Amino acid sequence: MLRAWQAECASQAIEKFTSNKHSHFFCQATPGAGKTVMAAEVASRLFERGMIDLVLCFSPSLTVAEGMQKTFSWKLECSFNGGLGSLGGSYTYQSIRFLDENFWNTVSKYRVLVVFDEIHHCSFDDEGRSNSWGLEIVNKIQDFARYTLALSGTPWRSDRLPIVMAEYSDPDGKVVCDYQYGLQQAVEDKVCRRPKIVLIDNEHLSVKAGSDNQHFASIIDCLKQSDVSYQSVIHNEDAMNFILNSGCQKLAQIRQESPSAGGLVVASSIKHAKDIQKRLVEHFNQSACIVTYHHDNPLHEIESFRQSKVQWIVSVGMISEGTDIPRLQVCCHMSSVKTELYFRQVLGRILRINDSPNQEAWLYTFAEESLIGFAERIEQDIPDSCMYIKQENNVPSAIDEKRLPSSTVSESVQPNRSQPSLLSWGETSDMINSNNAGFTLAFDELRLGQFKQRVIAAFI
């Protein structure tokens, strides 16, 4: 049975498509609301009306593509693997360039609905500021598709380039959506969980660099006024232990009511993820698995966790958007990626409602300046800071998706410090060589005292 918003959105899409005036529909619905089911409903109605012959779905990762294949196959009651007898197929954006001329010649003979999931991954404009995925869509798909349906939970780009096929208002540069379903409405409709974000800070930080000692009352002050980087925070033993302990305690509380509830840790690197998994198992006595883009079969790892009662899954770039694991209810955000888009997509992983008695959703992260801002703006569906900026000069996109795993495209790289050193937080910490964490630092020692937490509860 469709949710109310899914039925309403599907009806509006069909109405627009049948008007014979417009063939593109843009839906913005909060992460976790069920956009794929809505898209499959649109396809089903178009088939019933005899308006299409095939459906092609494109998404940013294999994980999402597999999920779309299952949903469309279920909704259309047929195979959806692109083979003989199927009504379509599900592919990644990266695969578009590898589909040969015979494929495009064949599908161009039919009336096709093309569904673009997480369309914000694809940028294009006439000024040359396009990425490879956006160019592929314009050059190979836009002209032959009878209808196009674009989906996004976060319809903006961190580089503030225009999304392919999207319309923008002037002069504020806000994306124009045919249908919007925000997080507040989703919470009120009990479609999504009400998020609570915990910002972890420290009141007594000290940094030793040579003979100099600096003292700070917050993480923000320390990062702004010293050579300490955010990488130092997320790799520090005391900091990691504190955030993981907080997450483990909350997950234990939730599992008293909902025994299958799980937690997600978003790490900054494979080495970081392995360290976190080891801590969860050995220090906190938790069951934990790990999934990264270096795994031979990450989809199997994710599916195995989805069906199990393992407490934690530690991920590097694999469970950030579009991955449907409703039993996730706690998240420890320890990634070095600090963009609003990534933050919201990660938060969306713990917001999907299921039939468990407890429906709490908790995200733990550190009180870094940008992360604080993201948390405080969580009630805005499209933050003002994420508007498309029109530039006079041609600026090519700095990212080429073909060189990176699709799930890590948004990741930024922190600049290395020039001097190796020893790093320590807290009076009882052992000194650790910062080179072992994959980066270098320009200070000798970092100590901190009492941790504190600030909870932001949205939509109260």
Walk through the language-model features, giving the residues of each.
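Conserved helicase ATPase motor motifs in RecA-like P-loop NTPase domains
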Residues: T30-G32, H120-C122, N139-V164, K190
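SF2 helicase catalytic motif II
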Residues: N105-A150
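Long, largely alpha-helical accessory region at the distal end of helicase-like NTP-driven motors
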Residues: I234-H235, A239-F242, K250, I372-I460
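Walker A/P-loop
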Residues: N20-V42
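Interdomain helical connector at the RecA1-RecA2 junction of SF1/SF2 helicase-like NTPases
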Residues: R160-S260
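Conserved pre-motif I regulatory segment
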Residues: M1-Q28
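Conserved RecA-like P-loop NTPase helicase motor core
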Residues: S287-K390
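Inter-Walker segment of RecA-like/P-loop motor cores
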Residues: Q69-V107
